[in-house]
Amino acid sequence: MGTPCQSARGPRTTPLPHCPPPCLPGAPDQQTRRLPPGWGQRTAPTQVGLADAASPDELQDQASGARPGGGNRVGAGRGRPGTPAPSRQSRRTGPAEQADHAHSNPTGGCSDPQRSPRTRQAGYALGEGSAGLGSRGPRPHPAFQVQWSARNPGCPRTWRRRSGAQRGHPPPGAGQRPSGPTGGRPAAPGAPGTPAAPGPGGGAAVPSGATPHPERGSGPADPPAAARLPPERQEPRLPQDLAAAQRCPAGPPPTRSGAAAQRTHRRPPGCPRSARNPGCPRTWRRRSGAQRGHPPPGAGQRPSGPTGGRPAAPGAPGTPAAPGPGGGAAVPSGATPHPERGSGPADPPAAARLPPERQEPRLPQDLAAAQRCPAGPPPTRSGAAAQRTHRRPPGCPRSARNPGCPRTWRRRSGAQRGHPPPGAGQRPSGPTGGRPAAPGAPGTPAAPGPGGGAAVPSGATPHPERGSGPADPPAAARLPPERQEPRLPQDLAAAQRCPAGPPPTRSGAAAQRTHRRPPGCPRSARNPGCPRTWRRRSGAQRGHPPPGAGQRPSGPTGGRPAAPGAPGTPAAPGPGGGAAVPSGATPHPERGSGPADPPAAARLPPERQEPRLPQDLAAAQRCPAGPPPTRSGAAAQRTHRRPPGCPRSARNPGCPRTWR
């Protein structure tokens, strides 16, 4: 046998320094039991050099003494981490015999006398035997290490749900997302080990014809196979989104800090993502809105790329531009552009050629529709405003199909905001429990046709909200809302032309979403400024309750409704109303108590009153149900629905649509 220490049956002499622990004398099974945990179970058996022989037949060779010095280096490949490490033979034999193999083997446990266990462990770092103790699969080529991203780690809807739900906490591990050999920075296309240039002949070790890395792709390569499917057939997934962002002819969007980074420059009309403005509100809204307050993790870095987030000359080498077949600027005319990323002088993708009504509503098409707006992309604004920008012209699919008449979007995303809109459960309250009442039933704002509301002289159109006022709607308001040009100024104009007069002034965002106008009124009918606009405006300020929100519902009863007619209540403000109001006297409209007349200013019809905060409050108090309960924060404004009889109710301070 070799040196004295290597035979368990030989005389006990001093062990040599280079022998591994199992060589120490003792009962064979004890030796096996004393192995450090993990040695000999997961990876190649300890008795054989890790890099040298790990497969059953090699073990057998060595055990029979056939091959003294070192295992077969080619065979070492067969013992790669993926293979079941302990050989079948050693599993069949018990621990004692296993130990025996090591000792009947000519060089004992050290198949290479020059290497101590420590050196052998260092072999891991050199990538020799296994990728590490307990490693489960072959270590992939560095260029493919990030494939998880392409495998659609979840349709944006999912991600959004996942991260949005966690509001305030970035999705776990978010910061690390842009990883990979180059730490998330682009590398020179084709540099060894980069995920770059994944076309045939692309990244260093990608054999020509290999599938390029689907997400990081760059260089004059074809789009990845998955991307060649028309958008309908692709699963909508976040990475592809991101990819699309990069391949916009205008280059990636400029970097902004904070949440602004995501909703940045609208892409040029030719670009799908551009048009779909920078990512169909549905997605982006969901993505950014959900995490409101925390930019999506790593947002600042997202728009990177060879040109550092600035647009490059289309077709410049290494730009993410024009990814049609043959890459570079010139998409040969007639070539089908990449259906989602499409760019260059190409037609819109086939799916996009259908009129919006005939397309299935799906994220990509959303995007497409956005892009087909005759008015071109909306102007860029900074901050949250960027996403909810110019109204589309009446001809425009996105305006028409309203897939984001932000009324919808706002509602949709706002609703998913993680918290149900405050007070949601209570909202539909009132005498009829939120159900429509028989037209003309006493106390309802219903039946606003001739002969409708209680005391409206027959033939006069009642003011649907206040229930009085023989005024006709302004001429402009007689057009159906579709035929009116949607435009901000007219919005405002309409607000003034409401038979009910302008809305009371409030400070902060509240000022904009105020009382609903009667159906006759353009702004009313359009509900007070088709929430598309108003939503846009006020929604933007979301996050800070309009100043003073908490104090709003005050008054003698501290914001709680009081028994109608109780002394000092704001209740029953009709003739004969509050307790001490002499019958026939008009109660004080704001405090609703005492024999006082309303202040002179309050006697003017609303149109003639200057809009001012107190009157607002007054309106709140004059609700038969009393002022809304006080809530803190923004909740204060969108509170309980007033009963139909109440002016502020009717304009329901907050018809969720408005207030929301």
Curated annotation (Swiss-Prot):
Residues 104-116 have a biased composition (Polar residues). It comes from the Viruses. Residues 177-196, 302-321, 427-446, 552-571 have a biased composition (Low complexity). Keywords: Early protein, Repeat. Residues 67-80 have a biased composition (Gly residues). Transmembrane segments: none annotated. Residues 149-648 are annotated as: 4 X 125 AA tandem repeats. Sequence repeats lie at residues 149-273, 274-398, 399-523, 524-648. Residues 1-660 are annotated as: Disordered. This is Uncharacterized protein BHLF1.
